[in-house]
Curated annotation (Swiss-Prot):
PROSITE patterns, per the entry: TIM_1, TIM_2
CDD domains: TIM
Organism phylogeny: Eukaryota, Metamonada, Diplomonadida, Hexamitidae, Giardiinae
EC number: 5.3.1.1, 4.2.3.3
The protein's annotated pathway: Carbohydrate biosynthesis; gluconeogenesis; Carbohydrate degradation; glycolysis; D-glyceraldehyde 3-phosphate from glycerone phosphate: step 1/1
Catalytic residues identified in the record: H96 (electrophile), E170 (proton acceptor)
Species assigned in the record: Giardia intestinalis (Giardia lamblia)
Name of the protein described by the UniProt record: Triosephosphate isomerase
Length: 257
C-alpha cells in the first residue's frame, strides 16, 4: 500500500452555537492526535474565529467550508482566499455537493475556486460525487470524472498545485441519509478516480494523491472503509459534531498507519 498520509476532515456545515464550537473544538484539540495523520475541521464562516481561538493543538487544523473565485471586492456575502489566509487558515473545502446541487455552483466555478485557492498556497479538499439517479443510470464514473476534468482543465499538469489537492468522493445519495456506500462501491470509484489521474495528469502522482470518502461515514463503518487500499481517509459530516469524531481519528490511525 502506498505511503499516503491519512486525512480526516470534519465538515460542521451550518451547525453549532458559539458555546458548542468552543467546547467541541477544545475537546478535539485535547484529544491525542498523532503527527502521522492530518486532522482538519471546518466550522461555519461565522464560527471560524471562535474555533481558531479554541484550538490549542498543533496537530489540528481549521478549514473553511467555501471560498470565492475572486479576490477582495464587491462580492456581497462571499469570502476571499486572502481573508481566509489573514485568519491563518491553510485549508478549504471546495465543490461540496450541497454547494453544487442546492446553491447552483457549476463544475467550472468549483474548479476556478480551487485553482485560485491553490495558487495562493492553500490546500483544497475538492469534492466530487454522483446522485442516486446518476448511479442507477450507470453514470457514476462519468459524473465524477467530469467534475475532476473541470479541475484538470484549470490546473493542467501542474504538480505544484495538484500536490495540495485532497479529492473527496462523496456520493450524493449517501450524504446525510444514513445510507453508506459499501466498501466495494467506494473502492471501485476511488480506483477509477486514481486511474483517471494517472492517465490524464501524472502516473507517478496518482500513487500519492489522497482520495478520501465522505457520505454518512461514522465510527461504525470507517474501519472497513479505511481498510480499502485506495481510501485514504474521510470527510465526515454529522459524526464530526459528536465525540464519535475522536473515535474515528483513532480508528483511521490504527487502520492506515
Amino acid at each position: 500500500m502506498p505511503a499516503r498520509r491519512p486525512f480526516i476532515g470534519g465538515n460542521f456545515k451550518c451547525n453549532g452555537s458559539l458555546d458548542f464550537i468552543k467546547s467541541h473544538v477544545a475537546a478535539i484539540a485535547a484529544h491525542k492526535i498523532p503527527d502521522s495523520v492530518d486532522v482538519v475541521i471546518a466550522p461555519s464562516a461565522v464560527h471560524l474565529s471562535t474555533a481558531i481561538a479554541a484550538n490549542t493543538s498543533k496537530q489540528l487544523r481549521i478549514a473553511a467550508q467555501n471560498v470565492y473565485l475572486e479576490g477582495n471586492g464587491a462580492w456581497t456575502g462571499e469570502t476571499s482566499v486572502e481573508m481566509l489566509q489573514d485568519m491563518g487558515l491553510k485549508h478549504v473545502i471546495v465543490g461540496h455537493s450541497e454547494r453544487r446541487r442546492i446553491m447552483g455552483e457549476t463544475d467550472e466555478q468549483s474548479a476556478k475556486k480551487a485553482k485560485r485557492a491553490l495558487e495562493k498556497g492553500m490546500t483544497v479538499i475538492f469534492c466530487v460525487g454522483e446522485t442516486l439517479d446518476e448511479r442507477k443510470a450507470n453514470r457514476t464514473m462519468e459524473v465524477n470524472i467530469a467534475q475532476l476534468e473541470a479541475l484538470g482543465k484549470e490546473l493542467g499538469e501542474s504538480k505544484m498545485l495538484w500536490k495540495e489537492v485532497v479529492i473527496a468522493y462523496e456520493p450524493v445519495w449517501s450524504i446525510g441519509t444514513g445510507v453508506v456506500a459499501t466498501p466495494e462501491q467506494a473502492e471501485e470509484v476511488h480506483v477509477g478516480l486514481r486511474k483517471w489521474f494517472a492517465e490524464k495528469v501524472c502516473a507517478e502522482g496518482a500513487q500519492h494523491i489522497r482520495i478520501i470518502y465522505g457520505g454518512s461515514a461514522n465510527g461504525s463503518n470507517c474501519e472497513k472503509l479505511g481498510q480499502c487500499p485506495n481510501i485514504d481517509g474521510f470527510l465526515v459530516g454529522g459524526a464530526s459534531l459528536k465525540p464519535e469524531f475522536m473515535t474515528m481519528i483513532d480508528i483511521l490511525t490504527k487502520t492506515r498507519t
